[in-house]
Regions:
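Basic, polyanion-binding surface patches
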Residues: 1-156
Length: 156
């Protein structure tokens, strides 16, 4: 298994923060598996660890947001990747963000893009769950900034 983990560490991935608002708080997590899977209709997919709290929340709440981070947002990525982290509002305190009109979820400003989505299909996949979602709207696109990436277990 360690060989498989090492193999996957060689794959460059974008870094995205996925957020959802539940009855009590805003919750989010840093993910490396977020991608477009269809242009017509516009569909995206995120893969979440079955043991994670966000996985549990997305099984109960269909609408969520994805903020694709820019190269200058390593701190945001690290905050949302830390185990035992507080709610998303505290993690984003002092950082530019806003609430999405379509999902109600927090959106990180200053990334390369952000969108709001609604889950249309849930696919169990080993120790993860794939959430396929229709794009409700693109919140912003900023082609002037470079994306944050993860390669060999480090943000770059």
């Amino acid at each position: 298994m360690n060989e498989f983990v090492e193999s996957m560490a060689q794959v460059v991935t974008g870094v995205t923060v996925v957020t959802v608002k539940d009855e009590r708080d805003d919750v989010g997590v840093t993910v490396g598996t977020f991608t477009s899977i269809s242009l017509d209709p516009p569909l995206v997919m995120v893969s979440l660890d079955n043991a994670g709290y966000l996985n549990e929340l997305l099984l109960r709440h269909d609408r969520w947001a994805a903020s694709v981070l820019s190269a200058g947002q390593k701190t945001v990525a690290s905050r949302f990747a830390t185990a035992g982290r507080p709610g998303a509002r505290l993690l984003l305190a002092g950082m530019p963000h806003h609430r999405g009109e379509l999902s109600g979820a927090l959106i990180v400003d200053g990334g390369v893009t952000a969108l709001e989505a609604e889950t249309v299909k849930v696919v169990p996949a080993g120790d993860h769950t794939l959430f396929v979602a229709k794009v409700l709207g693109v919140d912003y696109v900023d082609a002037s900034v470079l994306p944050l990436s993860r390669y060999r277990s480090r943000y770059r």
